[in-house]
Amino acid sequence: MLTTSSARFDVAVVGGGHAGVEAAAAAARCGARTALVTHDPATIGAMSCNPAIGGLGKGHLVREVDALDGLMGRVADAAGIQFRLLNRRKGPAVRGPRTQADRKLYAAAMQTAVAETAGLTVVAGACEDLAFDAEGRLCGLVLADGRTLACGAVVLTTGTFLRGLIHIGERQIPAGRVGEAPAVGLAQTLERLGLRLGRLKTGTPPRLDGRTIDWSGLEMQEADAEPVPFSTLTERITNPQIRCGITRTTRAVHDLIRANLHRSPMYSGGIASRGPRYCPSIEDKVVRFGDREGHQIFLEPEGLDDPTIYPNGISTALPEAVQRDLVRLIPGLERVEILRPGYAIEYDYVDPRELDLGLQVKRLPGLFLAGQINGTTGYEEAAGQGLVAGLNAARHAGGLGIAGFDRAESYLGVMIDDLVTQGVSEPYRMFTSRSEYRLSLRVDNADARLTPRGIALGCVGGHRAAQFAAGQAALGAARARLDAVSLTPSQAAPHGISLNRDGIRRTGFQLLAYPEIGWADLAAVWPDLAEVPPRIADRMKTDATYAVYLDRQNADIAAFRRDEAVRLPPGLDYAAISGLSNEMRVKLETVRPGTLGQAARIEGVTPAALTLLAAHARRGARAPSAPADRHPA
């Protein structure tokens, strides 16, 4: 651990949460000398809210982080205690891997992963300010104790710490999370630098003592019999798998909440900022969905040897006494004890439209932001941004250009494009529905989509690269074998495979596209196929199922990339474009899109404005002196 008064690094990352660890590890994997600055190294990898990783859309992000050799997938596999594949009955494109995680195991595994990352130094301290040289260029950090860290790039991953304020009923407690001081000086620095700041809110439920819950009458949710790991490097899940309980709120609970709404800061005027739409407080649920008989609550154990229960579904900021009365009106919780009250927390965030596609602040080269500071919510969203910001910080420190990810290749690209193009008015979370190319962006092909890119960018290590090459070779061999065998309808019939009597010969791959034909059916015809590992067989089935649809989607992707190829100069003077209305100029200047495609995704930008931009871009491309955009889409 660093103890000197000053030191020189290539990259300094502020914050040891889910964004910070991925940013620091990614920068270090890219060869940058990296510092991870955190108040308390013992809190690295802490799960501040729910004890779970993954889910719908979120599981895709974890797989993509893993494909780029990030940490979250491997750590979740090491700490997972209830693996479930969500949306199992739906198509492969929208299935989402998820696991409950043992909090202590998760933090311990993450801290081990950080400690084992070459080139990464953990620095205990609080970042109070940014340092700039005589020319106004960012050159380091100033810590609260007076130490300075000189560096070539900074990544801020401050979570809920920027002027964080906890609310419990009428009480207000300045804090980044329970028991930890907020980052006030750093928020003032960002304000002084002229960045557009806003205020958001999130919340968490009370923690319950599982030993005081009556589990006997509750529905129990089992883990999957065969856990699906997040990381392609994980051979098997070794932790015991646990069950979660399910209960519901009642009319009595709703009546109590309504009677005390005036004491909730969201309804008393104590909090004016917006919370996450898809993770509302129990107060919001009762107000917005007043006709419902009850709301489901998942009672999630926080560890294998920890009696603490996370009641997923009743986030609240009501006074502690009301919280106690509230939970004791819920079936199974009549005698429950609260270990820690729920609370809401407000915090500052930076308008993500200040950023480019590499998560660098446009007006402050070398400063990168990731996680809740960009207006997102969720561990997985934070981890994905952290990885992208970290690898780009390393590139900036090394004199290289920004590397962006586009919407057609990853959910990382979808998320970042949404943030920097649309901005946020409430905490942003990922869903598969946000992607227009989700048939291509599946959890099962994240490595095929992104690992080659990661190898080219230098953030994928040799072990993963070798494992990926072996996996791709196995997929290629399986596909070649399927393409080499075929059957006519009359040949298929004796094997119990029913096809239209059209006389057409179909390859093994084409046969696999039929919903009723599985790998076992083909192996009964060609026995050597039984030797193909299940993971490879499942991937072949998915590829065959989606083949026709992917051909159509690839045409859409080609059109998308044509617009993305029309670059707009970063210093473009929109006032000089004749015919643009003042409204269009304001929208474009706020985002400063890098491509015509990104401009088209800005809310309210008209086709007429896009035509003017396209004409201007074509004229600029013909002019030898036209500035080039160094930020690829």
Swiss-Prot record:
SUPFAM superfamilies: FAD/NAD(P)-binding domain (SSF51905). GO terms for biological process: tRNA methylation; tRNA wobble uridine modification. GO terms for cellular component: cytosol. Transmembrane segments: none annotated. It comes from the Bacteria. Homodimer. Heterotetramer of two MnmE and two MnmG subunits. NAD-binding protein involved in the addition of a carboxymethylaminomethyl (cmnm) group at the wobble position (U34) of certain tRNAs, forming tRNA-cmnm(5)s(2)U34. Belongs to the MnmG family. This is tRNA uridine 5-carboxymethylaminomethyl modification enzyme MnmG. The gene is mnmG.
